[in-house]
C-alpha cells in the first residue's frame, strides 16, 4: 500500500477568529490575493501523498467555504463543535469510513504550510506514531505570577514552539480523542497534549518559521507585506477586442447582459470587455492570447459565456504564484451607454475574477462618430492588466 493510499489530513476551520479583527472568520479572509483557507487546503489537496482531505467547518459557513475552496479536492465538510478539540474529533469520526493509517491534523489559520513540512509529517508518523513540527524559541521566556512578577526563566534550549500539521497513527489518536471526550476533558489546546495525556510519546520534527498561525490584525498586515515583497516581478499586458453587431436584443459587456437593439456576431457570447481583459492578462504572463487558448475553430466554445475565460486567465496567474494588481477596461461605442452600468460592471468583474473591486476600473469613450464604432456597427474594447509574480515564475 502506498503512502498516498493510507494518509489522510484534517483541516480544522470551524473557529470564528475574533482576535483577527473585523471581516468575518479569519480563515475566509484574503491574504496575498487568496483566502486563508484556500491556501491551507490547497497545500494538502495538491500533495501527492495525501489521499483524503477532510475539512471541518462551522455549519453556518458551508456556503462561504464552498466558494472559498472551489476547485480543490476535499471530502464533504464535517461540522465543527464548540471547541477545537470537538472539531478535531468530528473530523476523525468522518474519516473512519476511509480507514487511513496516518492522519495529519492542521489548523486552517496556518496558510503557509509547505509541501516539505507535510512530507516530513508523513514520514515522522510512519516512524514514531505521533509527532509534531516545531521551531526553536529565539526569545528568552519568562514564567510569571498572576500579578506579572517573574518567578522563573526556563532554559531556552529545551523549549520549542509547536506547529501543525500534528501527525499520528489514526486509530491511536482517534481512541485518545474519544477517551478524552468520554472523560469530559474538553480544553486541550492541541492534539499532542491529548496524546501526551493518553500516555503516548510524541516526537518532534523540523517545522518552518513561515508556517505561522494568523491570529491578530497585525499578523495579516505583516504577512501581506511579506508576500508582496516576494512578488517583485511586476508585469503589464494589454488587450483589444472588437465585435460587429448582428441580429439580437442584447449584448454581453463585462459580464453583464445589457439590453440593446442589436446583438453580437461572435463565436462565444462576444463579450468584448472580458475578452480584452483576458488578452491583457495572458499578455502579462507572456502566455499567448485568447485565441490560442480558446480557438474559434473549436465548437466547444460556441456560445460560451466569457466569464469562464476570465476565470481561466486568473487561474493561470495564481498557478504561477502570482496575483493581479490592477484590471482596467475601456469600452469604445456610441451605444449602449456604459456610464450608468460602470459600477455594476466593476462588481461583476470582481465577482468573476476574485480581484478586489478597488483594483478594477471600467471606462468608456466614443470615437466621435468616426469609424465602425461611430457608425454603430459594433463595439471595441481595450484593456490593461498589471500582475505581480515571483521572480522564479
From Swiss-Prot:
Pathway given in the UniProt record: Isoprenoid biosynthesis; isopentenyl diphosphate biosynthesis via DXP pathway; isopentenyl diphosphate from 1-deoxy-D-xylulose 5-phosphate: step 2/6; Isoprenoid biosynthesis; isopentenyl diphosphate biosynthesis via DXP pathway; isopentenyl diphosphate from 1-deoxy-D-xylulose 5-phosphate: step 4/6
Matches recorded under Gene3D superfamilies: 2-C-methyl-D-erythritol 2,4-cyclodiphosphate synthase, Spore Coat Polysaccharide Biosynthesis Protein SpsA, Chain A
GO annotation (BP), single: isopentenyl diphosphate biosynthetic process, methylerythritol 4-phosphate pathway
Chain residue ranges for the region called 2-C-methyl-D-erythritol 4-phosphate cytidylyltransferase: 1-234
Top-rank taxon, per record: Bacteria
Residues that hold a divalent metal cation according to the record: 241, 243, 275
Molecular function as annotated in GO: 2-C-methyl-D-erythritol 2,4-cyclodiphosphate synthase activity; 2-C-methyl-D-erythritol 4-phosphate cytidylyltransferase activity; metal ion binding
Cofactor field: a divalent metal cation
Catalytic reactions of this protein: 2-C-methyl-D-erythritol 4-phosphate + CTP + H(+) = 4-CDP-2-C-methyl-D-erythritol + diphosphate; 4-CDP-2-C-methyl-D-erythritol 2-phosphate = 2-C-methyl-D-erythritol 2,4-cyclic diphosphate + CMP
Region (2-C-methyl-D-erythritol 2,4-cyclodiphosphate synthase) location: 235-393
UniProt xrefs under Pfam families: IspD (PF01128), YgbB (PF02542)
Enzyme Commission number(s): 2.7.7.60, 4.6.1.12
Keyword entries, A-Z: Isoprene biosynthesis, Lyase, Metal-binding, Multifunctional enzyme, Nucleotidyltransferase, Transferase
InterPro entries named in the record: IspD, IspD/F, IspD/TarI, ISPD_synthase_CS, MECDP_synthase, MECDP_synthase_CS, MECDP_synthase_sf, Nucleotide-diphossugar_trans
PROSITE patterns noted in UniProt: ISPD (PS01295), ISPF (PS01350)
Record-annotated site: Positions MEP for the nucleophilic attack: 156, 213
Marked site (Transition state stabilizer) residue numbers: 19, 26, 267, 366
Known role: Bifunctional enzyme that catalyzes the formation of 4-diphosphocytidyl-2-C-methyl-D-erythritol from CTP and 2-C-methyl-D-erythritol 4-phosphate (MEP) (IspD), and catalyzes the conversion of 4-diphosphocytidyl-2-C-methyl-D-erythritol 2-phosphate (CDP-ME2P) to 2-C-methyl-D-erythritol 2,4-cyclodiphosphate (ME-CPP) with a corresponding release of cytidine 5-monophosphate (CMP) (IspF).
Family the entry assigns: In the N-terminal section; belongs to the IspD/TarI cytidylyltransferase family. IspD subfamily.
Protein's name in the database: Bifunctional enzyme IspD/IspF
Organism from which the protein derives: Bradyrhizobium sp. (strain BTAi1 / ATCC BAA-1182)
Amino acid at each position: 500500500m502506498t503512502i498516498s493510499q493510507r494518509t489522510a489530513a484534517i483541516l480544522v476551520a470551524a473557529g470564528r477568529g475574533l482576535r483577527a479583527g473585523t471581516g468575518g472568520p479569519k480563515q475566509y479572509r484574503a491574504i496575498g490575493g487568496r483566502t486563508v483557507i484556500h491556501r491551507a487546503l490547497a497545500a494538502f489537496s495538491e500533495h501527492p501523498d495525501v489521499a483524503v482531505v477532510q475539512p471541518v467547518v462551522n455549519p453556518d459557513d458551508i456556503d462561504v467555504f464552498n466558494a472559498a475552496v472551489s476547485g480543490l479536492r476535499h471530502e464533504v465538510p464535517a461540522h465543527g463543535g464548540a471547541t477545537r478539540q470537538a472539531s478535531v474529533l468530528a473530523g476523525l469520526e468522518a474519516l473512519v469510513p476511509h480507514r487511513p493509517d496516518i492522519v495529519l491534523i492542521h489548523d486552517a489559520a496556518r496558510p503557509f504550510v509547505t509541501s516539505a513540512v507535510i512530507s516530513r509529517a508523513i514520514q515522522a508518523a510512519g516512524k514514531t506514531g505521533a509527532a509534531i513540527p516545531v521551531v526553536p524559541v529565539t526569545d528568552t521566556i519568562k514564567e510569571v505570577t498572576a500579578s506579572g512578577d517573574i518567578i522563573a526563566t526556563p532554559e531556552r534550549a529545551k523549549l520549542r514552539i509547536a506547529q501543525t500539521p500534528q501527525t499520528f497513527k489514526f486509530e491511536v489518536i482517534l481512541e485518545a480523542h474519544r477517551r478524552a471526550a468520554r472523560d469530559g476533558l474538553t480544553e486541550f489546546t492541541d492534539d499532542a497534549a491529548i496524546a501526551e495525556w493518553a500516555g503516548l510519546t510524541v516526537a518532534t520534527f523540523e517545522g518552518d518559521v513561515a508556517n505561522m498561525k494568523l491570529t491578530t490584525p497585525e499578523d495579516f498586515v505583516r504577512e501581506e507585506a511579506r508576500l508582496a515583497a516576494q512578488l517583485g516581478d511586476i508585469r503589464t499586458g494589454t488587450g483589444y477586442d472588437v465585435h460587429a453587431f448582428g441580429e439580437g436584443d442584447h449584448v454581453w459587456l463585462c459580464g453583464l447582459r445589457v439590453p440593446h437593439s442589436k446583438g453580437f456576431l461572435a463565436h462565444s457570447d462576444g463579450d468584448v470587455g472580458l475578452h480584452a481583459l483576458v488578452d491583457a492578462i495572458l499578455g502579462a504572463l507572456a502566455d499567448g492570447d485568447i485565441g490560442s487558448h480558446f480557438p474559434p475553430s473549436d465548437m466547444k466554445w460556441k456560445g460560451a459565456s466569457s466569464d469562464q475565460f476570465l476565470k481561466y486567465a486568473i487561474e493561470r496567474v495564481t498557478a504561477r504564484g502570482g496575483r493581479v494588481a490592477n484590471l482596467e477596461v475601456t469600452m469604445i461605442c456610441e451605444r449602449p451607454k456604459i456610464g450608468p452600468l460602470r459600477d455594476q460592471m466593476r462588481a461583476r468583474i470582481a465577482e468573476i475574477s476574485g480581484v478586489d473591486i478597488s483594483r478594477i476600473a471600467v471606462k468608456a469613450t466614443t470615437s466621435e462618430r468616426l469609424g465602425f464604432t461611430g457608425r454603430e456597427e459594433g463595439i471595441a474594447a481595450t484593456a490593461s492588466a498589471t500582475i505581480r509574480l515571483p521572480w522564479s515564475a
